Amino acid sequence: MQPKRRAFCLASLAALAACAADRAPARPASLAGRAWDVAARRFVKTAEARARIAAATVALLGETHDNRTHHEIQRSILAEALRMGRRPALAMEQIDLEWQADVDRAIANGASPAQIGVAAHATRGWDWPAYSPMVALAMSNRLPVVALNLPRERTRRIVGEGLDALGPGEATRLALTATWNPQRNARLRREIVQGHCGDDSPIVDKLVDVQRAKDAVMADRILEASARGVVAILGRGHARRDLGVPLYLAARAPALQVLSLGLVEIDPQAHGVEDYPEARRGRFDLLWFTEAARREDPCLAFKGVPVPR
C-alpha cells in the first residue's frame, strides 16, 4: 500500500514520450517515462506498452496513490482503450463497495466528477481531484464506475474476527483458501512490516488477513464486470501477480486475460532496472517508471518523530 493508507494497510504527460527498445543498463535519471517488459527483460516503447495494456480484458494499473503522474498515465490508458473501440468499466479502489448505489445514482443524475467523489465518500483520505479526469472520461463515454474497496466496517471486523468476518463460505468462494500457503503468507507479512517502517507488532498478522480479503474482494468485483472489460485503478501492491488481485483472478477464471502494470517511482539509490524489486519475475507484466512525488518521509510520523512543515 501507499503512504496515505499505511496507517492501516500495507502495499507530467510530457515525460511519457515513447522511447526506443533498449537492453542497455539505465541510470535512475534515464528511467522516468520508460516502460519495462518484465518477462522479456527489455525496455519497450511507451506507446507499445500503453496499447498492450489497453487491449487487455482486465488491466490492473498499480499506482502510488499520491503520484499525479501515475493518474495521468492511467487516464491515457483508459483513453487508448476507448480509441480502440473498447468500453471497459472503470473500477476503483478509491470507492468502497457500500457507496456503489450512491455513485450509480449520482452518475444517472448527471453529477460532476467532484460530486461523484462526494457520493463515494472519497474526498477524505484520497486526492480525489487527481482521479477526477479519468472519472470524467468514463462518465463522458457512459462507462460504468465500479467500487472495489472493502468498507471500513468490514475491515475492522476482519481485524477482530479474521476472514470469517466475510461470511459463511466466502473464504472458499473467493479462493482465499485455495490460493494461500505458508510461503505466500510469510512474503506478504514481510511486505506489510516493510510498509509499516519495520514495525513488527502483533497487528501485522491481522493486516495480512485484511490485505488478502481486499485483494480477493477486488478480484470478485472485477470478475462481475469482466464481460465488458475492466480498467482497474488500485495500489501497486494489489496489482502484484504473486500476492494480489491477479492471484485470485487466476484461481477463479484461469482463461481471463489479465495484464498487471506496476507504476514505479524512481529510486535515487538504484543503478538500473534490476535493482527494483518490482522487476523480479512473477510480480508484474509491465513496469512504467516515473519521477517520485514530493512527500515527507511517512516513517517519521509513524515513529512519532515530528514532521517538518
Tell what function each PLM region has.
Residues R41-R42, T46-L82:
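Zymogen propeptides
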Residues L13-A21:
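Hydrophobic h-region of N-terminal signal peptides that target proteins for export
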Residues A101-A225:
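A substrate-binding/cap region within the structured catalytic cores of diverse enzymes
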Residues A89-Q94, S260-G262:
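Short internal beta-strands
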Residues M1-A14:
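N-terminal secretory signal peptides and thylakoid transit peptides that target proteins
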Residues V217-D220, H238-R309:
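C-terminal regions of proteins
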Residues A20-A56:
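N- or domain-start disorder-to-order transition segments that initiate the globular core
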Residues N67-H71, R87-A89, L97-D104:
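Membrane-embedded segments
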